[in-house]
């Protein structure tokens, strides 16, 4: 029997990951490829929950900076995450994986409301659960949503797949050829060094609850499965030493 390191995970999937090379919008081929990666991990027996972002469709904070009321801008972004969630759900179900979408804002015609106990029950029954609409409140990022939901469902770790970046660096490796990669960090390191991984609210919540985080390159086929099996790829972030 395959030795699985993480038996229940919270996958943080950025909206940009669904855009592929386009950089914005939704690329259905890219979404289908991600769904196949998730299916491979699901087939191992790992329980998977997903928090999906919406940056490929909308960003609330920049909109607020040019005059849009911040709460309204953030709520618009929550609708974007729901669009992404429904597209991902469709790809997963076409791949043969039963999937449920739960939203933090009630949209009963298209998804279940977020109910912790029901989400855990879905996971126990072998369904993938996608959490959409953030926390349901403005001013909170989907990174913070990921940290919150991971703790609520008692996940073993948060898995954060990046586009073309294979871990956490001391500076942007796409802009600095001499950027240094970290293989291990603590959440306190991230806060003290000001590393751009998660926002400080998400990092603090993860640190306070000793929630591990693994950051890896989602674009490399099989990487998600390797992380779940415990291979040392990307960067692993743990509680304070």
Curated annotation (Swiss-Prot):
<dbReference type="InterPro" id="IPR015963">
    <property type="entry name" value="Uridylate_kinase_bac"/>
</dbReference>
<dbReference type="InterPro" id="IPR001048">
    <property type="entry name" value="Asp/Glu/Uridylate_kinase"/>
</dbReference>
<comment type="subunit">
    <text>Homohexamer.</text>
</comment>
<comment type="pathway">
    <text>Pyrimidine metabolism; CTP biosynthesis via de novo pathway; UDP from UMP (UMPK route): step 1/1.</text>
</comment>
<keyword id="KW-0808">Transferase</keyword>
<feature type="binding site">
    <location>
        <position position="74"/>
    </location>
    <ligand>
        <name>UMP</name>
    </ligand>
</feature>
<dbReference type="GO" id="GO:0044210">
    <property type="term" value="P:'de novo' CTP biosynthetic process"/>
</dbReference>
<feature type="binding site">
    <location>
        <position position="59"/>
    </location>
    <ligand>
        <name>ATP</name>
    </ligand>
</feature>
<dbReference type="GO" id="GO:0033862">
    <property type="term" value="F:UMP kinase activity"/>
</dbReference>
<feature type="binding site">
    <location>
        <begin position="12"/>
        <end position="15"/>
    </location>
    <ligand>
        <name>ATP</name>
    </ligand>
</feature>
<keyword id="KW-0067">ATP-binding</keyword>
<keyword id="KW-0547">Nucleotide-binding</keyword>
<comment type="function">
    <text>Catalyzes the reversible phosphorylation of UMP to UDP.</text>
</comment>
<dbReference type="InterPro" id="IPR036393">
    <property type="entry name" value="AceGlu_kinase-like_sf"/>
</dbReference>
<keyword id="KW-0418">Kinase</keyword>
<dbReference type="Pfam" id="PF00696">
    <property type="entry name" value="AA_kinase"/>
</dbReference>
<dbReference type="GO" id="GO:0006225">
    <property type="term" value="P:UDP biosynthetic process"/>
</dbReference>
<feature type="region of interest" description="Involved in allosteric activation by GTP">
    <location>
        <begin position="20"/>
        <end position="25"/>
    </location>
</feature>
<feature type="binding site">
    <location>
        <position position="55"/>
    </location>
    <ligand>
        <name>ATP</name>
    </ligand>
</feature>
<feature type="binding site">
    <location>
        <position position="163"/>
    </location>
    <ligand>
        <name>ATP</name>
    </ligand>
</feature>
<comment type="similarity">
    <text>Belongs to the UMP kinase family.</text>
</comment>
<keyword id="KW-0665">Pyrimidine biosynthesis</keyword>
<feature type="binding site">
    <location>
        <position position="172"/>
    </location>
    <ligand>
        <name>ATP</name>
    </ligand>
</feature>
<protein>
    <recommendedName>
        <fullName>Uridylate kinase</fullName>
        <ecNumber>2.7.4.22</ecNumber>
    </recommendedName>
</protein>
<dbReference type="InterPro" id="IPR011817">
    <property type="entry name" value="Uridylate_kinase"/>
</dbReference>
<keyword id="KW-0021">Allosteric enzyme</keyword>
<feature type="binding site">
    <location>
        <position position="54"/>
    </location>
    <ligand>
        <name>UMP</name>
    </ligand>
</feature>
<keyword id="KW-0963">Cytoplasm</keyword>
<feature type="binding site">
    <location>
        <begin position="135"/>
        <end position="142"/>
    </location>
    <ligand>
        <name>UMP</name>
    </ligand>
</feature>
<dbReference type="GO" id="GO:0005524">
    <property type="term" value="F:ATP binding"/>
</dbReference>
<feature type="binding site">
    <location>
        <position position="169"/>
    </location>
    <ligand>
        <name>ATP</name>
    </ligand>
</feature>
<dbReference type="GO" id="GO:0005737">
    <property type="term" value="C:cytoplasm"/>
</dbReference>
């Amino acid at each position: 029997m395959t030795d699985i390191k993480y038996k229940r995970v919270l996958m943080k999937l950025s909206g940009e990951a669904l855009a592929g090379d386009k950089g914005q919008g939704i690329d259905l081929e890219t979404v289908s490829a991600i769904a196949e990666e998730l299916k491979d991990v699901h087939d191992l027996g790992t329980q998977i929950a997903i928090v999906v972002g919406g940056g490929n469709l909308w960003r609330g904070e920049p909109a607020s900076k040019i005059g849009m009321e911040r709460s309204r801008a953030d709520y618009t972004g929550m609708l974007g995450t729901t669009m992404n969630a429904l597209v991902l759900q469709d790809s997963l179900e076409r791949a043969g994986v039963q999937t449920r979408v739960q939203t933090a804002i009630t949209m009963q015609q298209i998804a279940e409301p977020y109910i912790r106990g029901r989400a855990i029950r879905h996971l126990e029954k072998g369904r993938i659960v996608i959490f959409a609409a953030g926390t349901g409140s403005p001013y909170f990022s989907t990174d913070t949503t990921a940290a919150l939901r991971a703790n609520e469902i008692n996940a073993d770790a948060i898995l954060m797949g990046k586009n073309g970046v294979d871990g956490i660096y001391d500076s942007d490796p796409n802009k600095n050829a001499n950027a240094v990669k970290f293989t291990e960090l603590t959440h306190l390191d991230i806060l003290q060094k000001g590393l751009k991984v998660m926002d400080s609210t998400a990092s603090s919540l993860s640190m306070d609850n000793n929630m591990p985080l693994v950051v890896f390159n989602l674009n490399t086929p099989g990487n998600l499965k390797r992380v779940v099996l415990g291979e040392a790829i990307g960067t692993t972030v743990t509680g304070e030493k």
